């Protein structure tokens, strides 16, 4: 089994983006991302640290805002509005899921889609589903496609099965695979066991984003498949694991590990989106 590691993919994206950052800085444009975190979720904090490190490596400025977990929705909306108006900020990332007192749709709708570098707004989603190129796709969904591209897997004519139908990964990665001329089946919580097994065994590429440890067992997979594991789960021993059972992964032709796979590409894609947003902003100002 070939291990599809994320680091070389992330490094390739980073190197290309750094050249663009240098070009923008030579024009007096400094790419900048603002992050908004509500509360002290350990996962959010870890992701935030990763963003800070990556931004520093790439010459991207970052502005961090942390709110207590009990703030009102009005305060959060006010901060988003301020960042929408700040011309020095090119991208805004809101750590989600938010605490229960927030209406997620209202928060996402409040963000200017031109600064939506993680694809959470309807404007960005429309760009993904119509192929208009407006906004940005969700970073993790794009990371899946970028990994396949980097390792030379052409999806043209291939059968792809996606496990999970969220707006963050499942639905957008389905559309992005279709755009690369794949035939895509999407499975979800209401898919019958028989259909689930058939869809898993008959695919050339499997992408799983269910969020359940060992979900994708060997009896759901076929032979000589490519598996991208997007799941991040508690392994019960203080670490993390993906959705793919080890036996299923070892039987694949190639599979991404967790950790060290798709997740490590996500932050690089996010930074690339910030750079692109900065370049677009510069063109609009001319």
Question: Predicted segment positions?
Answer:
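Short beta-strand segments enriched in small/hydrophobic residues
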Residues: 30-39
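Short, well-structured alpha-helical segments in soluble
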Residues: 75-87
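Positively charged, low-complexity intrinsically disordered leader regions
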Residues: 1-29
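Rossmann-fold NAD(P)-binding glycine/threonine-rich loop
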Residues: 105-125, 228-282
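Short glycine-/small-residue-rich Rossmann-like dinucleotide-binding loops
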Residues: 97, 209-212, 231-232
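Short beta-strand elements in bilobed, periplasmic/extracellular small-molecule ligand-binding domains
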Residues: 55-69, 184-187
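Glycine-rich phosphate/diphosphate-binding loop of Rossmann-like nucleotide-binding domains
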Residues: 38-52, 135-226, 238-248
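Anion-binding alpha/beta catalytic cores of soluble intermediary-metabolism enzymes, centered on
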Residues: 91-155, 197
């Amino acid at each position: 089994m070939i291990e599809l590691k994320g680091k070389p993919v992330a490094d390739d994206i980073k190197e290309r983006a750094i050249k663009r950052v240098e070009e923008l800085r030579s024009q007096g444009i400094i790419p900048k991302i603002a992050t908004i975190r509500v509360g002290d979720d350990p996962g959010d904090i870890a992701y935030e640290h990763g963003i800070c490190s990556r931004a520093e490596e790439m010459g991207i400025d970052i502005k961090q805002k942390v709110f207590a977990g009990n703030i009102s929705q009005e305060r959060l909306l006010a901060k988003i509005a301020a960042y929408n108006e700040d011309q020095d900020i090119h991208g805004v990332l809101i750590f989600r899921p938010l605490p229960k007192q927030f209406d997620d749709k209202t928060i996402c709708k409040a963000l200017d889609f031109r600064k939506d570098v993680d694809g959470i707004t309807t404007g960005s989603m429309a760009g993904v589903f119509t192929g208009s190129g407006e906004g940005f796709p969700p970073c993790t969904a794009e990371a899946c496609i970028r990994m396949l591209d980097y390792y030379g897997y052409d999806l043209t004519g291939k059968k792809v099965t996606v496990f999970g139908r969220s707006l963050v990964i499942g639905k957008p990665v389905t559309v992005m695979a279709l755009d690369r001329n794949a035939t895509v089946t999407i499975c979800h919580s209401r898919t019958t066991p028989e259909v689930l097994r058939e869809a898993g065994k008959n695919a050339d590429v499997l992408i799983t984003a269910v969020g359940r440890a060992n979900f994708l067992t060997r009896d759901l997979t076929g032979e000589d498949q490519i598996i991208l594991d997007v799941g991040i789960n508690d392994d019960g021993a203080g670490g993390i694991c993906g959705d793919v059972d080890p036996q299923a992964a070892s039987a694949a032709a190639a599979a991404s590990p967790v950790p060290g796979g798709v997740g490590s590409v996500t932050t690089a894609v996010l930074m690339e989106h910030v750079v692109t947003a900065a370049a677009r902003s510069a063109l609009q100002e001319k």
